[in-house]
Regions:
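Short gly/ser-rich loop at a beta-strand->alpha-helix junction or flexible surface loop bordering the NTP-binding
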Residues: 30-39, 50-111
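Hydrophobic alpha-helical interaction segments
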Residues: 113-195
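Short, mixed-charge, low-aromatic patches
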Residues: 6, 16-24, 86-94, 126-130, ...
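Short, structured interface segments that constitute the first stable element of a domain
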Residues: 6, 13, 96-122
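Short acidic (Asp/Glu) patches
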Residues: 45-46, 83-87, 114-119
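Short coil/loop linkers at secondary-structure junctions
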Residues: 14-15, 72, 181
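A residue-level signal for beta-strand positions that form part of recognition/binding surfaces
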Residues: 2, 98, 155
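Short beta-edge/loop segments at beta->alpha junctions of small alpha/beta modules
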Residues: 1-63
Length: 195
């Protein structure tokens, strides 16, 4: 479970110096530091469970979500998340791994991510469509439709069967909100595939 310094100080308020108690808990491995002022109590928990807590608001997206949904063949080791209003890429490294956060437009942020459960622990994960759109948002602009297809299926190594099964209505709804060339190309490609 993710817990903040404030919560720990409150829980340990009966101690004369609760900060020393917290330091001892860290040394014993009862608390694992995630970032300044934030800890995890379960050393065996998978890192993706902490991604939303380390920096919020956020949901897991980009390469990690594409891999999670089996859309790309690579296993992604960095926990990649979407956020907004941070104005630059943020990165945190701790004993659970590396966590990166990238901005997407605020108006598209609330669409198409799901609350998933791992045991009884919730986390937020982008849908397949949203993960792809987020990834295309941060990619360098690709002008021609042929080059765009090559980027999707050879560069990203996107699974073509999964691509064909994506919900085109979701993509049509959010793609224009990104205001990026790659998302317009994605809309064009989907229209071409439908014919």
């Amino acid at each position: 479970m993710v817990i903040s310094s404030e919560e720990l100080l409150f829980e340990n308020r009966s101690y004369a110096v609760p900060q020393i108690r917290i330091q001892r808990m860290v040394k014993k491995g009862e608390l694992i530091p995630l970032k300044r002022g934030m800890y995890e109590t379960d050393s065996t928990a998978p890192g993706f469970l902490m991604a939303n807590a380390i920096l919020g608001p956020s949901y897991i997206s980009f390469e990690y979500a594409l891999s999670y949904h089996s859309m790309i063949p690579e296993r992604v080791m960095t926990y990649t998340s979407a956020t907004f209003g941070k104005n630059k890429k943020k990165e945190f490294t701790n004993s659970f791994g590396t966590f990166t956060y990238r901005d997407i437009p605020q108006e598209v942020f609330p669409y198409y991510y799901n609350r998933e459960l791992y045991g009884n622990r919730p986390y937020l994960m982008a849908s397949r469509e949203k993960a792809l759109c987020d990834q295309l948002y941060i990619a360098a602009p690709i002008r021609g439709i042929h080059d765009f297809e090559e980027f999707l299926f050879d560069g990203l190594r996107l699974d073509e069967d999964i691509f064909d099964s994506l919900d085109s209505e979701k993509i049509k709804r959010i793609a224009p909100l990104y205001h990026k060339t790659n998302l317009y190309q994605l809309e064009k490609l989907i229209e071409k595939e439908k014919r």
